[in-house]
């Protein structure tokens, strides 16, 4: 039953990002699903000449691995990548998006979902497609565009991986 559930569809990306149980297959949160989503966000960013991203995480199972996967994909796409120094609450990521003047913020968290879940939220820092975000969560049509990019990615093996990013200083937490 669990194997069938793991491969019985895809997690859907929307304004709340992605959320689901940590498990294998396209209907779960795992490195492949996160990598595909990160690559789609990188493509979305490139289309709009957005070049910087800050990534945060909570302490849930898988969050650290998903952060690493995201940082590698974003770095490989040529983005300036910042990673928050440790597990932190989501509002710190939104604050850091503005404070670091990043174009995009990505938070690895399932928020209020059950503990066996994880998730992925996206924030925008500046003006994108005529909407001034200032570190707020995406709204339509950004979610639809990212979702279309996810659908267009057929293989992660062709996605370049980078290993260059900056760990944000703890001072950002004090400023928050």
List where the protein language model places each region.
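An N-terminal, well-structured beta->alpha segment
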Residues: 1-76, 171-176
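Gly/Ser/Thr-enriched, mixed-charge loops and adjacent short helices
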Residues: 2-11, 119-176
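Short, amphipathic alpha-helical segments
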Residues: 35, 64, 87, 136-140, ...
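Alpha-helical scaffold segments in soluble metabolic enzymes
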Residues: 36, 40-43, 92-96, 145-149
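Ferredoxin-reductase
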Residues: 48-128
